[in-house]
């Protein structure tokens, strides 16, 4: 992904500069997350946007129709520039890089949380408080994902620190302890 990162960085930096000047960087960060969810969940949309068969103007019209009313003009302009320059292949890299630069600028720590099942609102709130305490700051952005292979519990990645409170992790550690003992 280094090549995509080097391609994505100028676009992400430009978007951050524009949104910072307009006071909408938080709004655009939220929009990046929403657009990434759409991008990841719809293979048809993704395939159409990266297809060399579709003309840039058709892609821009589709983007305008799909998200034009729900995103800031800055975000819409970026999407149109990516379409014009045939760079929609790097769409997710641009969004992720923007989020990374935004967090860095705002002093926000990213916590990646994988749970065995979807968490309720109350569980998310409790987990958020615990992660904030672990990070030592209230400025924590939590990226939740579901990983059924964990069997139960969750795994929190906070920078280089990993807290494995999953059933699969406990079974693995028990197996290692038994192997060591014999």
Curated annotation (Swiss-Prot):
The keyword Acyltransferase does not apply. F-type ATPases have 2 components, F(1) - the catalytic core - and F(0) - the membrane proton channel. F(1) has five subunits: alpha(3), beta(3), gamma(1), delta(1), epsilon(1). CF(0) has four main subunits: a(1), b(1), b'(1) and c(10-14). The alpha and beta chains form an alternating ring which encloses part of the gamma chain. F(1) is attached to F(0) by a central stalk formed by the gamma and epsilon chains, while a peripheral stalk is formed by the delta, b and b' chains. One of its GO terms (cellular component) is plasma membrane-derived thylakoid membrane. It is found in: Cellular thylakoid membrane. Pfam families: OSCP. InterPro entries: ATP_synth_OSCP/delta_N_sf (IPR026015), ATPase_OSCP/dsu (IPR000711). It is a peripheral membrane protein. The gene is atpH. One of its GO terms (molecular function) is proton-transporting ATP synthase activity, rotational mechanism. Gene3D superfamilies: N-terminal domain of the delta subunit of the F1F0-ATP synthase. SUPFAM superfamilies: N-terminal domain of the delta subunit of the F1F0-ATP synthase (SSF47928). Keywords: ATP synthesis, CF(1), Hydrogen ion transport, Ion transport, Membrane, Thylakoid, Transport. F(1)F(0) ATP synthase produces ATP from ADP in the presence of a proton or sodium gradient. F-type ATPases consist of two structural domains, F(1) containing the extramembraneous catalytic core and F(0) containing the membrane proton channel, linked together by a central stalk and a peripheral stalk. During catalysis, ATP synthesis in the catalytic domain of F(1) is coupled via a rotary mechanism of the central stalk subunits to proton translocation. It comes from Parasynechococcus marenigrum (strain WH8102). This is ATP synthase subunit delta. NCBIfam families: ATP_synt_delta.
